[in-house]
């Protein structure tokens, strides 16, 4: 739950009482203030996870070095691909921090498998009665990022085919396309 400002965040000390593993992106403005997060960390015990809205290695590293976050957050779709996120993971590891990968998909699974300091696969926006809106049926072979992708041991498999391990289902992509643009 995001806050409008530091006064709102003080009310969020309930996270401490509940023993939550982290408090993610506490500020509604995108959470890019190093000073704001340093100040917040003085008033809550729950570890802070930010950098989801920080779009480059240098700024995310600055936030980690400044003590504004307890975790790094990386997303191959926005943070320089798998390579850019892997660099961020190494920076976090060098500072004794973990990186948590944002969102789901084959690239995210491969990134997590390549990082020894990542813990949780995000199957986002799910509920037992609602599908994951980010899990689009664009891959062949039954790949899924629905709740059932997590096995009985709490693990998620990593595709092992060439590239990211998945082949696109072009028939399904074309069937559900709303428009087509050809660049020449």
Task: Tell where the protein language model's regions lie, with residue ranges.
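Fold-independent oxyanion-binding glycine-rich loops
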Residues: 26, 52, 160-161
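Shared catalytic-loop signature of beta/alpha-barrel
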Residues: 13, 19, 30-155
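Periplasmic-binding protein-like
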Residues: 24-25, 99
């Amino acid at each position: 739950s995001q806050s409008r400002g530091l006064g709102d965040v003080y009310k969020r000390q309930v996270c401490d009482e509940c023993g939550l593993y982290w408090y993610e992106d506490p500020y509604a403005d995108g959470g890019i203030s190093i000073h704001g997060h340093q100040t917040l960390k003085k008033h809550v015990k729950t570890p802070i996870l930010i950098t989801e809205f920080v779009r480059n290695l240098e700024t995310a590293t600055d936030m980690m070095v400044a003590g504004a976050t307890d975790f790094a957050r990386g997303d191959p779709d926005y943070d320089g691909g798998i390579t850019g996120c892997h660099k961020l993971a190494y920076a976090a590891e060098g500072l004794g921090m973990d990186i948590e990968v944002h969102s789901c998909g084959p690239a995210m699974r491969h990134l997590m498998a390549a990082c020894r300091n990542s813990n949780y696969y995000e199957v986002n926006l799910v509920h037992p009665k609602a599908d994951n809106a980010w899990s689009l049926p664009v891959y062949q072979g039954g790949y899924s990022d629905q709740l059932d992708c997590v096995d009985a041991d709490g693990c998620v498999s990593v595709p092992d085919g060439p590239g990211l391990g998945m082949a696109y289902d072009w028939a399904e992509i074309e069937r559900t396309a709303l428009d087509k643009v050809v660049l020449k």
